[in-house]
């Protein structure tokens, strides 16, 4: 009997592969436990259709991330912080403050966990890197000014 593997099965194959197995193994174990489906024409057509939809969604998501990367590259955030008499910042600028400023000034919401930078402790222009997903990284600038 031919089965379409839904999940990876050790010593048999990976999800998405079509395998020839003995009837008892296919019916009583693979299909019963949810590891596979009988490889009928209908199941194969649905699997191919789902695979195409998934690929299209991935292309759409990557295109949106590339657009976001382009938008972010044009941004320079302005952040004002109190400074001491010697010109050093009190505390510094954290990822949380950068994410909040990005949302307030550019209306782009990014999780602070995806920002790749340390706390900035000096005035001036700094570059911030962002992990957007699917191996796409963006960079934007922040300008830290004295209050």
Swiss-Prot record:
UniProt similarity note: Belongs to the bacterial ribosomal protein bL9 family.
Gene3D superfamilies assigned to the protein according to its UniProt record, in alphabetical order: Ribosomal protein L9, C-terminal domain, Ribosomal protein L9, N-terminal domain
GO biological process: translation
Function: Binds to the 23S rRNA.
InterPro entries (alphabetical): Ribosomal_bL9, Ribosomal_bL9/RNase_H1_N, Ribosomal_bL9_bac/chp, Ribosomal_bL9_C, Ribosomal_bL9_C_sf, Ribosomal_bL9_N, Ribosomal_bL9_N_sf
Gene Ontology terms: cellular component: ribonucleoprotein complex; ribosome
Keyword entries, A-Z: Ribonucleoprotein, Ribosomal protein, RNA-binding, rRNA-binding
Keyword Ribonucleoprotein among record annotations: yes
Provenance organism: Campylobacter jejuni subsp. jejuni serotype O:6 (strain 81116 / NCTC 11828)
A Pfam family per the record: Ribosomal_L9_C
Protein name: Large ribosomal subunit protein bL9
HAMAP family membership: Ribosomal_bL9
Recorded superkingdom: Bacteria
GO molecular function: rRNA binding; structural constituent of ribosome
Gene name, Swiss-Prot/TrEMBL: rplI
PANTHER family: 50S RIBOSOMAL PROTEIN L9 (PTHR21368)
